[in-house]
């Protein structure tokens, strides 16, 4: 049992090169993790550790202590970041890392800088009477979803490790405690900018913007108006990101401004879920009672959040307020067109088209309307269409996606007519479609089954199996065909919950 913090024992397990700690002291609060009773390493992402240039052998040896927060690695400068945020439309001027502690930063072999953060590592000055801890269920969920998003090719924070703490956490029930180690390009959020803007701290906004440009958008240093260019670049990355969410049926669930990164990575997977049957109004998050963050609302919420970012940057964009507003408005108004372009390009890939013609949007919308009316599973329908693109014999299986199999006949006729003008061969098309239409997603019921086995029985075999399947989402994996299937009525997950 490790009962107290130890420092500097593991040597160079983490080659830290910290920069955020060099910002003004009111950007964060120095905060060491709180030791736990009996940490046990559930999972170490050895491939990611190697990519980051970490000492994998040292992490195998000391990982339970390091990733629980009991053993602070040499070079770490642990801190909790300050930020604010709009939560379901209401502004909170002070949120901050209430259960997360940034150990420091590392630079990988390609020169990219990443944060190493512990979630559930104990209370911080931003905990707001919380215990700063996390339960094992949300930790496993975040591990599964973040690694699945990576495998799907969607920018997202990564999972480096998960540990149990040997201590209970007290929620609606008593649950086993755990700590999650997250890797991110950075943890700077729209809400980080809002924190300083809400205090009238223009110097703080400027220091943060300069840091973000230097870290994430260095080419913008040469722009005529670097701060306007920064706003434009963040809008572009978010438009592309949210389009990718929609392409795989992902519903974030809690798109508050403190959960939107300026790096363009998906972050915070608490109540997120993947859609089964296609319905644009789908909501899973238990706290989203009015559907603010429903599947189809996500692009508009993204624009709303980015407008809040633009507001914080106005004093930097132009000293003349009206001119600053006009310039920022021009950027935010372009978001809709950008999103639509990214979304349509991806949807055309999903139905096998290499180029765009007039009428293609109508073809996509017709399929989505048919899927909604017929209760078709989002992921399976597009995967089966990929199979049909390469083999007409797969038509009965595609038709079986719909409650009334004959209902898809008219759409298939239109689709095939359109394919006749597409330059790809059938084989090329099928290969391309299978590379964008996954066979496997983190089905909500599969995630819950893995969590329940771990929580109730200490059995992590389903967790490991699910991680393995989801690491190759675009491969058929015949031995795991059951993981492709949507839930039976008795298996449906109706609501997801915040946790980490």
From Swiss-Prot:
Enzyme class: transferase
EC nos: 2.7.7.-, 2.7.7.108
Binding site for ATP: 96, 98-99, 119, 131-132, 182, 189, 268
Superkingdom as given in the UniProt entry: Bacteria
Keyword Nucleotide-binding annotated: yes
Keywords tagged on the record: ATP-binding, Magnesium, Manganese, Metal-binding, Nucleotide-binding, Nucleotidyltransferase, Transferase
Molecular functions per Gene Ontology: AMPylase activity; ATP binding; magnesium ion binding
Positions bound to Mg(2+): 259, 268
Catalytic function, reaction form: L-seryl-[protein] + ATP = 3-O-(5'-adenylyl)-L-seryl-[protein] + diphosphate; L-threonyl-[protein] + ATP = 3-O-(5'-adenylyl)-L-threonyl-[protein] + diphosphate; L-tyrosyl-[protein] + ATP = O-(5'-adenylyl)-L-tyrosyl-[protein] + diphosphate; L-histidyl-[protein] + UTP = N(tele)-(5'-uridylyl)-L-histidyl-[protein] + diphosphate
Active-site residue numbers: 258 (proton acceptor)
Cofactor(s) in the UniProt record: Mg(2+); Mn(2+)
Similarity comment: Belongs to the SELO family.
Purpose: Nucleotidyltransferase involved in the post-translational modification of proteins. It can catalyze the addition of adenosine monophosphate (AMP) or uridine monophosphate (UMP) to a protein, resulting in modifications known as AMPylation and UMPylation.
Protein name: Protein nucleotidyltransferase YdiU
Natural source organism: Rhizobium johnstonii (strain DSM 114642 / LMG 32736 / 3841) (Rhizobium leguminosarum bv. viciae)
């Amino acid at each position: 049992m490790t009962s107290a913090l130890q420092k500097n024992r593991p040597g160079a397990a983490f080659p830290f090169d910290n920069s955020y700690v060099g910002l003004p002291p009111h950007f964060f609060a120095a905060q060491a993790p709180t030791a736990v009773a009996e940490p046990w390493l559930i999972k170490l992402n050895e491939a990611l550790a190697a990519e980051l240039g970490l000492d994998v052998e040292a992490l195998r040896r000391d990982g339970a202590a390091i990733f629980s927060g009991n053993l602070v690695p040499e070079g770490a400068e642990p801190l909790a970041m300050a930020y604010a945020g709009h939560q379901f439309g209401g502004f909170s001027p002070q949120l901050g890392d209430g259960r997360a502690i940034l150990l420091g930063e590392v630079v990988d072999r390609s020169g990219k800088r990443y944060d190493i953060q512990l979630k559930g590592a104990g209370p911080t000055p931003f905990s707001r009477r919380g215990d700063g801890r996390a339960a094992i269920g949300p930790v496993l969920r975040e591990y599964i979803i973040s690694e699945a998003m990576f495998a799907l090719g969607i920018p997202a924070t990564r999972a480096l490790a998960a540990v149990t703490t040997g201590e209970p956490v007290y929620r609606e029930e008593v649950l086993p405690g755990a700590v999650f180690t997250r890797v991110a390009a950075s943890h700077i959020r729209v809400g980080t900018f809002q924190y300083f803007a809400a205090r009238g701290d223009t110097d703080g906004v400027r220091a943060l913007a300069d840091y973000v440009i230097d870290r994430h958008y260095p080419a913008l240093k040469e722009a005529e108006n670097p701060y306007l260019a920064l706003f434009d670049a963040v809008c572009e990355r978010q438009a592309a990101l949210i389009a990718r969410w929609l392409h795989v049926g992902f519903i974030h669930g809690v798109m508050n401004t403190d959960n939107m990164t300026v790096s363009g990575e998906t972050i915070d997977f608490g109540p997120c879920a993947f859609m089964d049957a296609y319905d644009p109004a789908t909501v899973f998050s238990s706290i989203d009672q009015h559907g603010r963050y429903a599947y189809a609302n996500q692009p508009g919420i993204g624009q709303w959040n980015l407008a809040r970012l633009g507001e914080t940057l106005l004093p930097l964009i132009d000293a003349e307020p009206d001119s600053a507003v006009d310039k920022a408005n021009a950027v935010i108004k372009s978001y809709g067109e950008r999103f639509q372009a990214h979304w349509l390009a991806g949807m055309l890939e999903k139905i096998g088209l290499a180029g765009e013609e007039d009428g293609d949007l109508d073809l996509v919308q017709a399929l989505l309307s048919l899927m909604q009316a017929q209760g078709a599973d989002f992921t399976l329908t597009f995967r089966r269409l990929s199979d049909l693109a390469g083999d007409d014999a797969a038509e009965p299986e595609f038709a079986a996606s719909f409650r009334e199999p004959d209902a898809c006949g008219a759409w298939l006729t239109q689709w095939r007519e359109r394919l006749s003008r597409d330059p790809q061969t059938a084989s090329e098309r099928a290969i391309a479609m299978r590379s964008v239409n996954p066979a496997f997603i983190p089905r909500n019921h599969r995630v819950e089954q893995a969590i329940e086995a771990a929580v109730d029985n200490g059995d992590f075999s389903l967790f490991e199996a699910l991680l393995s399947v989801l690491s190759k989402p675009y491969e058929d994996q015949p031995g795991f065909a059951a993981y492709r299937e949507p839930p039976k009525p008795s298996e449906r997950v109706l609501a997801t919950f915040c946790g980490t």
